[in-house]
Amino acid sequence: MAATADREKALATALQQIEKQHGKGSIMRLGEQETVKIAAIPTGSVALDVALGVGGLPRGRIVEIYGPESSGKTTVALHAIANAQAEGGICAFIDAEHALDPEYARKLGVDTDSLLVSQPDNGEQALEIADTLVRSGALELIVVDSVAALTPKAEIEGEMGDSHVGLQARLMSQALRKMTGALNAAGTTAIFINQLREKIGVMFGSPETTTGGRALKFYSSVRLDVRRVETLKDGSEMVGNRTRVKVAKNKVAPPFKQAEFDILYGQGISREGSLIDMGVDCGIITKSGSWFSYNNEQLGQGKENVRKFLRGNPDVANEIEDKILTHLGLREAEVPEGVDPRTGEVEF
């Protein structure tokens, strides 16, 4: 018993010293604190928010978005920027590909006047800028587009045909080691957009891999695999793509869930389309033949007409979204006045 008391006393002294040197909360017993609900940035698609399990992209974490060309990777990232800005956050876009279209970003709801944009000359410069911005503690979200375009300085200054094996992988590994703790401390989300490559000589399993080595796979809390599954048509005119996103890795909720949504050309993710799909799945919107109804009132015939109705009636769209998220446990239901929130019984 005396030995146990001595150990407890020594531990208490050590904990006090740690908190004195590194600040309160730098070490704690796991049972002392209640589980904190993970804050998230909405993606623009309620279906994807639900698949992520926390209502969007987790704050203070690294997210990798990868997939084939023109699958919707940058569109998802720009919608996240627009939603973060709508909540008053400051966002940055590291445009390593030098391909950002400000006009398209504006159509998606991005405030381009306040968006911080950098078009770096090489990979080292891009990641140093990103690291400095993160350590300022002022950012809500930073996007790096793309990992494949983070070319090391030595490769840019070298000759064509020179071998630079593993340079980019080492660069990414070092940068992510430095940034991970700073992102968590600042509550900043970092989105790395990545491209696909083919592994040569693979006989079994998928030959696809992402660029930049293995570090990003390890450090990412969420990895999203974005694929275009079909082309949307209005008559004979192509108006957009049906996109499927698989949550390939998720450290904050169960992984491997999938979400499908529409990306319309010039408009981005169709929020209304996701609300219709999820509303029908949850039983909040009723579908009878080609007619859709909500609260016993017809919304319209055909998905396109309902989409137009919800776009013109944002209050109805917001109400449906609230009900979907509440139904799926991602948003707490409003408790009427005079009702006990724990039991649901009326208080007298």
Curated annotation (Swiss-Prot):
GO aspect biological process, one term: DNA repair
Any one GO molecular-function label of the UniProt entry: single-stranded DNA binding
Matches recorded under Pfam families: RecA, RecA_C
Locations listed in the record: Cytoplasm
Record keywords: ATP-binding, Cytoplasm, DNA damage, DNA recombination, DNA repair, DNA-binding, Nucleotide-binding, SOS response
Assigned GO CC terms: cytosol
Family of this protein: Belongs to the RecA family.
Role this protein plays: Can catalyze the hydrolysis of ATP in the presence of single-stranded DNA, the ATP-dependent uptake of single-stranded DNA by duplex DNA, and the ATP-dependent hybridization of homologous single-stranded DNAs. It interacts with LexA causing its activation and leading to its autocatalytic cleavage.
Disulfide bonds: none
Predominant localisation class: cytoplasm
Organism expressing this protein natively: Cutibacterium acnes (Propionibacterium acnes)
SUPFAM superfamilies: P-loop containing nucleoside triphosphate hydrolases (SSF52540), RecA protein, C-terminal domain (SSF54752)
Binding locations of ATP: G67, P68, E69, S70, S71, G72, K73, T74
NCBIfam families from the UniProt entry: tigrfam_recA (TIGR02012)
InterPro entries for this protein: AAA+_ATPase (IPR003593), DNA_recomb/repair_RecA (IPR013765), DNA_recomb/repair_RecA_CS (IPR020584), P-loop_NTPase (IPR027417), RecA-like_C (IPR049261), RecA-like_N (IPR049428), RecA_ATP-bd (IPR020588), RecA_C_sf (IPR023400)
The keyword DNA-binding appears for this protein: yes
Superkingdom per UniProt: Bacteria
Name listed for the protein in its UniProt record: Protein RecA
Signal peptide: none
